[in-house]
Amino acid sequence: MLDFLAITLSGKPPQVIQGETVNLKWQWLGEGILTLVPHRSYTQSVVISAGIHGNETAPIEILNQLVTDLLAGQLPLSVRLLVLLGNPPAIRKGKRYLSNDINRMFGGRYQHYTPSDETRRASTLEQRVMAFFQASHTSERLHYDLHTAIRGSYHPRFGLLPYQQTPYSAAMFRWLRDIELDALVMHTSAGGTFAHFSSERCQAASCTLELGKALPFGENQLSQFSAITQGLRSLVSDSALPARKTENMKYYRVVKSLLRQHPDFKLRVAEDTVNFTRFAQGTLLTEQPNDNYRVEHPYEWILFPNPHVALGLRAGMMLVKMCESELPIT
């Protein structure tokens, strides 16, 4: 039986690149790229990606187990499915990326970088996702991009909705609620993420899922992500999810991107600051020539603080809380 992760890590294609089981047909489309199509009829085309950052191993392990169970017939398949391991060379080396962050390159932004394996990979992933969605006229398109964060978080499991000018899918929102996310963040401007690409270019209902903190293979406590794992299994098998057992999600929207625009940029937060740390109005957060930032709202929460990004890139985001009723859903 095909071992998706092991073959991807080997750097060599499988000897057999397509086959079928009692429930499905599968095809290897390239390194870390696999389609699975059920014999039965389906109404959804679903993309699940992991490993866009090579050191984010928990989502890779979760996705690989999902593929293993589908191919073994232990889990029925009810959707047309594309699974992707985003950056295999970085996964092999246990690094976030080798040259540049692929998750800043989508939507054609890779063309603005020095050509590398990672710019070529971003292009390949775009082409494969567009071709996958264009090849079927299913009524619903979904994309979940699985990640873990560099640092800890007051909300260990959270989602990020890409900016879009149309309302978000109500079905996707219900699924996100039922997989017991702690928080949901709404972007308010376009970006170079994989989820933004599939939303904007493919009209997919897309979301980036953050599952705890990045750890090496074998050190993840996957039990803390059991609701998300069950959610993915429910999604691909079209089975019901149990009702949410934890407290309601918290909702945030982005109000400021903290850009590092000068070599003397300083991010005035402690090195051990965790995601969703709160700061009061007037707090000085960034300093650089001609552009300091102080908290403008009564309270703002910081997400992804990282003062070491390259010039021109985002060193963090500032959020404000919002009500569920403020989220545009159709």
UniProtKB/Swiss-Prot annotation:
Annotated Pfam families: AstE_AspA_cat (PF24827), AstE_AspA_hybrid (PF04952)
Mind listing the GO molecular function terms for this protein? hydrolase activity, acting on carbon-nitrogen (but not peptide) bonds, in linear amides; hydrolase activity, acting on ester bonds; succinylglutamate desuccinylase activity; zinc ion binding
Which SUPFAM superfamilies does the UniProt entry name for this protein? Zn-dependent exopeptidases (SSF53187)
Report if keyword Oxidoreductase is assigned. Answer: no
Manner of cofactor binding, per the entry note: Binds 1 zinc ion per subunit.
State where Zn(2+) binds.
53, 56, 147
- Catalytic reactions on record: N-succinyl-L-glutamate + H2O = L-glutamate + succinate
EC annotation? Answer: 3.5.1.96
- Report TM segments: none
Query: Which terms are listed as keywords in the entry?
Result: Arginine metabolism, Hydrolase, Metal-binding, Zinc
Catalytic center residues: 210
Instruction: Enumerate the InterPro entries for this protein.
Output: AspA/AstE_fam, AstE_AspA_cat, Aste_AspA_hybrid_dom, SuccinylGlu_desuccinylase
Report whether Methyltransferase shows up as a keyword of the record.
no
Q: In which pathway does it act?
A: Amino-acid degradation; L-arginine degradation via AST pathway; L-glutamate and succinate from L-arginine: step 5/5
UniProt enzyme class: hydrolase
Write out the GO biological process terms: arginine catabolic process to glutamate; arginine catabolic process to succinate
This protein's cofactor list reads:
Zn(2+)
PANTHER family named among the record's database cross-references: ASPARTOACYLASE, SUCCINYLGLUTAMATE DESUCCINYLASE
Q: Which family does it belong to?
A: Belongs to the AspA/AstE family. Succinylglutamate desuccinylase subfamily.
Functionally, this protein is described as follows:
Transforms N(2)-succinylglutamate into succinate and glutamate.
Query: In its UniProt entry, what is this protein called?
Result: Succinylglutamate desuccinylase
